[in-house]
Curated annotation (Swiss-Prot):
This protein's name: Ribosome biogenesis protein BMS1 homolog
Modified residues (Phosphoserine): 188, 552, 625, 639
Biased composition (Basic and acidic residues): 653-667, 1228-1248
Reactions that this protein is recorded to catalyse: GTP + H2O = GDP + phosphate + H(+)
């Protein structure tokens, strides 16, 4: 066996190491490098062939020019929005697995379910928004319009599927993004050779569809259900470093790929009408162009909307800090996917929502109280209304009684009677009813039962019933300091009014929560309420609810024993009503605090009450936005504060009666506090002049705001907006000067009165700038401003003319001239520099370089325009710029969008231009797709995808003739363009579109029916169709004929006088005059005389109107799982098929077999004179006619006798039998020979086998003999040697 030659070592001939060796070798040989050789011997390096050099130069220039793209202005912001990466492919090809692996590669996190877009940080300056695209044609169209990069997954074991080619065609129409193919299922190939062939075949087919050299990535196999880490890492590096060219539609329109949706509709409106339009807020990164507030947007699959409000939020997936580093740390590897439930933090415009993982809302099962509350919430009318409309029948034959028939004496409110408790020494307030003395023990039990029932009924009553009860109670005991407390309630109610104009639903919720807190404070201040501590806990749990549970008098009587404890708990619970939103831990903590506070001394309670009063006084009174501040309101406010102070003093005196000693001088106590309160009352009574003149006084309360900010877990602060911001729109505009008696400024005396208020007016001598400058001594000589080029000359002395001084002052004052001079100087310097560069610079700059330089300058100007301003100011000027994370509020959204929301389908908000929201006539150039099997018919409804929209319309197809006529086509032509006109949304010219017959379900064949581009947007097009009018001649003269059957009246003939007519045979004519009889007949003149069999026709053109039908595709409003089943108007053929209506065929339109008569041609007759003149070869060869055979040469017919016929028949039968026997014998002989051949072959094989064995035996014996002979010869040789 020969050994294989080892592969020889090949020396490295390139690279830095080889270059060093070569240089060292040349130095050793004292030859030097190539540059030295060029200097030493330039002729050796001269041009050998000018033609070859020109060819190489042209080739290099061609290669350079091929790489050029038309430069565009770089409009990408400093913090660009995330790159949209669409992972597209057929079902079961590995899309979700690839997304999970990419997310794990970049963020080290694993997502269990991918729903909606997922935003991740992939590098120091790049973020990615990855979204999955299914095989629904609606989703494919929408994502192709916003994609920056498409990862097209291809099952290598199956090959290309139809969805791949459909998506490629969609991308070609709507602006071609970057496309990278990814081959999966490569581990299914067993043989490496087959794998290589498949890769090559798929790569070249992919290059045909995209462009030669398009990147095709290979994922070889899976390990534990995931792709290999190194391959995913390489794919991620390709995505991270990829460059993107801006697409025209995306850069000219703002758009948002929403990653979060929230319903802001009032729950009460939803409860009363579940089908009401919704108000939703959508969140996402703004891409494309700048977006202005209140602009028009289109949501594909839903419809057109106007932006109600837009605001920018902090970036939830911000780029890492701008510092030099080689890689990202673990904290900076962010992922943000709200629809997938990842991140845990949701950003709103005035709050940050943190997901605590369900630790604070754990509940084993829903209790019966929860079901009761839900049943109360679901009612559409209040219980009072139901009770008022209800009737009860006491007896079978009695009249039904209503609520108005019942005496209201039983519902009287209790009266208050103060009694001194001898055991405790405190004043107690007893509730006495009118019939208490008359009722007995049995009645008390019934009253207790009735009071319990009333308590249940009142527990479900609304606010209005409760306020009426409170008003009646205050009327009953006005003598016991109820008036002041009622004033306090009214004041707090006015403070807690809802704002007239809320910025958002969050403000409404906050205001409702404050109203709930105010009601709780009122309830806790009334001493007849029961168990104030429990009330505080329940109020803190359900702050802001519209209705509170009412209390019956019986409950108050039963709980009067614990009144002292409830009062102490109420005082401790009052300061805790700052926020109605608290958790269960906070509730238990408040209960513990209330128990601890019951043991406080009276002095501590007084100090706490003082602090509460001071806090309430320090807060500015909240006035509704529709209310104006005036002096009367100011006085009422101060009087209410005084009443509050007096009432609080009386309240403390009543509580401290049992603790103070009798006869003590109360006026000496707390003199410092009383003095402070008196000073405070004096300050409140003094009018605030600044507030009266300028309106609302905005003071700097940063320190107070910092103190009042609440912290959540020490991590986040609750961002509460300034309350005064909501009332700024309705406050007094102090910048507007209201003129009651305008001055006549044309009068000289009026102008002189304000002349000294302006710079150009006449000033006093000591204040006049010109005179002061004239008096200055000459300190400096002439000097020139090198920056602006202005020359300033010093004045010679104080006697210089005043005109020169005034001129110089004007030059210094005028900023426009200074700016223009500076600009001229800079232009002059720039031109000088360009001249210097053109003369002395060696590197020649091409036109392409100059164009790129201009684009870079424009990009720098665009960035520097608003660079120094903050975001809020920039938004007012240029709108919301791309890269911002914005929150958009949209009103009047169909309820199905919220109810049938599916996060797997993308929500895109596409901004519309000024005229793109209108609907009109659109003309376009269309071509039926070569892969679509059917042809398209005019007036058949079809779905177009133009711009952001997908809609159904009825187009008319036409073609332009050579004379400019737009002729209607019934069907689209094959393999060529035609025109199409339809009624639809206005779209800019040059926008691509595609047409689909249906978006419902999966069609078996290619779904894209046609593609094209928008041409024109006006109604000037006039589409006509051909109409042939036929008639018949009934009188024929020489060149004149009377024609009938073409028209119905003489008026129609008059309309067409002078029109050109023609016969089927081609004779042209003209219509002359109408005839009296028959009706519609006319006289016409022709080129030639007609025949009665001729048919006369006139070709006319009839204008066709374009159907005004526009139906947007609302696929996102369909239920979940049915979003790919949207169907609009059906075609005529579909309707016939659905209803089983067969088309009645027109007999004249049917194809009939062509019956042609066979023509018999006569023989060619050549005259004899011509035959003589013809040459011999062309002369007809005449042969003599065959004569009749003579009778003697004719053979007579043999007629056999019957006996002979029998013998002949017998011989035929015998010959047939003999031939049959011979055939059978031949077959048997063939079989015998075959068997004999087989036997001989078998014997031959056995013979060969025996011979082979015999040969082996002979050769073996012969070999043994030779070995023995060889051994014997070796032994003999050894013996001789010895």
């Amino acid at each position: 066996m020969e050994a294989k030659d080892q592969k020889k070592h090949r020396k490295k001939n390139s690279g830095p190491k080889a270059a060093k060796k070569k240089k060292r070798l040349l130095q050793d040989l004292q030859l030097g490098d190539e540059e030295d050789a060029r200097k030493r011997n330039p002729k050796a390096f001269a041009v050998q062939s000018a033609v070859r050099m020109a060819r190489s130069f042209h080739r290099t220039q061609d290669l350079k020019t091929k790489k050029h793209h038309i430069p565009v202005v770089d409009r990408t912001p400093l913090e660009p929005p995330p790159i949209v990466v669409v992972v597209m492919g057929p079902p079961k090809v590995g899309k979700s697995t690839l997304i999970q692996c990419l997310i794990r590669n970049f963020t080290r996190q694993k997502l269990t379910e991918i729903r909606g877009p997922v935003t991740i940080v992939s590098g120091k300056k790049r973020r990615l928004t990855i979204i999955e695209c299914g095989c629904d044609i609606n989703m494919m169209i929408d994502l192709a319009k916003v994609a920056d990069l498409v990862l097209m997954l291809i099952d290598a074991s199956f090959g290309f599927e139809m969805e791949t080619f459909e998506f490629l065609n969609i991308c070609q129409v709507h602006g071609f993004p970057k496309i990278m193919g990814v081959l999966t299922h490569l581990d299914s190939f067993k043989h490496n050779k087959q794998l290589k062939k498949t890769k090559k075949r798929l790569k070249h087919r992919f290059w045909t569809e995209v462009y030669p050299g398009a990147k095709l990535f290979y994922l070889s196999g899976m390990v534990h259900g995931e792709y290999q880490n190194q391959e995913i890492h390489n794919l991620g590096r390709f995505i991270t470093v990829m460059k993107f060219r801006p697409l025209t539609w995306q850069t000219s329109h703002p758009y948002i790929l929403a990653d979060r949706m929230e319903d802001l509709t009032n729950p009460e409106d939803i409860r009363t009408n579940i089908k009401c339009d919704r108000k939703v807020s959508l969140y996402g990164y703004l891409r494309g162009a700048h977006l202005k507030n209140k602009s028009q947007i289109h949501m594909p699959g839903v419809g057109d909307f106007a932006v109600s409000d837009i605001s920018f939020l902090p970036d939830p997936c911000a780029l890492p800090e701008q510092q030099k580093k080689r890689c990202l740390n673990e904290k900076e590897k962010l992922v943000y996917a709200p629809l997938s439930g990842v991140g845990g933090v949701l950003y709103d415009k005035d709050a940050v929502y943190v997901d605590l993982g369900g630790s604070h809302v754990f509940q084993d099962e829903v209790g019966p109280t929860h079901e009761l509350v839900q049943s109360l919430i679901s009612t559409h009318s209040t219980i009072d209304a139901k009770m008022a409309s209800s009737r009860v029948t006491l007896f079978s034959d009695s009249k039904p009684l209503g609520s108005e028939d019942i005496d209201n004496q039983g519902l009287m409110m209790p009266k208050e009677e103060k009694q001194m408790d001898l055991n405790t020494g405190r004043m107690r307030r007893k509730a006495i009813f009118g019939d208490e003395d008359e009722s007995g023990d049995s009645d008390d039990e019934e009253d207790d039962e009735m009071s319990e029932d009333d308590g249940l009924e009142n527990g479900s009553s609304d606010e209005e019933a409760e306020e009426e009860e409170n008003a009646e109670m205050t009327d009953q005991y006005m003598a016991v300091k109820g008036i002041k407390r009622r004033k306090l309630e009214l004041e707090e109610d006015s403070e807690m009014d809802l704002p007239a104009f809320a910025d958002s639903d969050d403000d409404l919720e906050r205001s409702s929560a404050e109203e709930g807190e105010a009601e709780e404070a009122d309830e806790s201040s009334e001493e007849e309420d029961c168990t104030a501590g429990e009330k505080g806990i329940s109020g803190s749990k359900a702050a802001g609810e519209g209705s509170k549970a009412g209390l019956s008098p019986a409950n108050c009587q039963s709980d009067r024993v614990n009144l002292e404890k409830s009062l102490l708990m109420k005082k401790a619970a009052l300061p805790t009503f700052d926020s109605g939103h608290c958790t269960a831990e906070e509730v238990f903590a408040s209960e513990d605090e209330s128990e601890e506070s019951s043991s406080l001394s009276a002095e501590e309670e007084d100090s706490e009450n003082e602090e509460a009063i001071r806090k309430k006084l320090s807060k500015p009174s909240q006035v509704s936005s529709g209310q104006k501040l005036g002096p009367q309101n100011f006085i009422d406010e101060t009087s209410d504060i005084e009443n509050l102070l007096k009432e609080e003093e009386d309240y403390k005196e009543e509580n401290n009666d049992s603790k103070e000693t009798s006869g003590a001088l109360k006026w000496k106590e707390d003199l410092s506090r009383k003095a402070a309160e008196a000073f405070l009352r004096q300050q409140q009574a003094a009018p605030n002049l600044r507030k009266l003149i300028y309106g609302t006084v905005t003071e700097d309360n940063e320190e107070e705001d910092d103190d009042t900010l609440e912290e959540l877990g020490g991590l986040f602060r609750v961002n509460q907006p300034d309350r005064e911001c909501k009332h700024k729109a309705d406050s007094l505009d102090c910048s507007r000067f209201l003129v009651e008696a305008p001055h006549d400024w044309d009068l000289e005396e009026v102008m002189n009165s304000i002349r000294d208020c302006f710079v150009t007016g006449k000033w006093e001598d000591d204040k006049d700038a010109a005179k002061v400058l004239a008096e200055d001594e000459e300190l400096y000589g002439d000097f020139e401003d090198l920056e602006t080029g202005d020359v300033h000359k010093g004045k010679s002395g104080p006697n210089t003319q005043n005109e020169d001084i005034e001129k110089e002052v004007k030059e210094e004052i005028d900023p426009d001239e200074e700016e223009s001079a500076k600009k001229k100087h800079l232009d002059k310097k720039r031109k000088l520099k360009e001249m210097f560069d053109a003369e002395y610079d060696e590197g020649e700059s091409t036109y392409f370089d100059d164009l790129k330089g201009e684009m870079q300058k424009q990009a720098q100007l665009n960035r520097a325009e608003f660079e120094d301003q903050d975001d809020e100011a920039r938004v007012q000027y240029e709108g919301f710029r791309p890269g911002m994370y914005v929150r958009i509020e949209i009103e009047n959204v169909p309820c199905e969008f919220v109810q049938n929301f599916d996060p797997h389908y993308p929500i895109i908000l596409g901004g519309l231009g000024n005229s793109e929201g209108n609907v009109g006539y659109v003309q376009m150039r269309l071509k039926k797709h070569r892969w679509y099997k059917k042809i398209l018919k005019s007036r058949d409804p079809i779905i177009f995808s133009v711009g952001w929209r997908r809609f159904q319309t009825i187009p008319l197809y036409y073609i332009e003739d050579h004379n400019g006529r737009q002729r209607l086509l019934k069907y689209t032509p094959q393999h060529m363009h035609c025109g199409a006109a339809f009624w639809g949304p206005i779209t800019p010219q040059g926008t691509g579109f595609l047409a689909i017959q249906s978006v419902s379900g999966i069609m078996p064949d290619f779904r894209i029916a046609a593609t094209g581009v928008v041409l024109d947007l006006d109604k000037s097009i006039k589409i006509v169709k051909k109409l042939k009018l036929t008639g018949f001649p009934y009188k024929i003269f020489k060149n004149t004929s009377f024609i009938k059957g073409m028209f119905n009246s003489a008026l129609e003939v008059a309309k067409f006088e002078g029109a050109v007519i023609r016969t089927v045979s081609g004779i042209r004519g003209q219509i002359k005059k109408a005839l009296r009889a028959p009706e519609g007949a006319f006289r016409a003149s022709f080129e030639d005389k007609l025949l009665m069999s001729d048919i006369v026709f006139m070709r006319t053109w009839y204008p066709v109107s374009i159907p005004a039908f526009y139906n947007p595709v609302t696929s996102l409003l369909k239920p979940v799982g049915e979003k790919d089943t949207w169907s609009g108007m059906r075609t005529t053929g579909q309707l016939r098929l659905a209803h089983g209506v067969r088309l009645k065929a027109n007999k004249d339109s049917l194809y009939k077999p062509i019956l042609r008569q066979k023509k018999h041609f006569n023989s060619l007759h050549i005259p004899k004179a011509l035959q003589k003149a013809l040459p011999f070869k062309n002369k007809p060869k005449t042969q003599a006619k065959a004569g009749k055979v003579p009778k003697d040469r004719r053979r007579p017919a043999v007629i056999r006798e019957p006996h002979e016929r029998k013998i002949l028949a017998l011989l035929d039968a015998l010959s047939t039998v003999h031939s049959q026997k011979m055939k059978k014998a031949k077959e048997q002989r063939h079989l015998h020979n075959k068997e004999h051949f087989r036997a001989k072959q078998k014997e031959e094989e056995e013979k060969l086998k025996r011979q082979k064995d015999l040969r082996k035996k002979l050769f073996r014996i012969q070999g043994q003999k030779e070995r023995r002979n060889q051994k014997s010869s070796l032994k003999g040789a050894e013996g001789q040697l010895q």
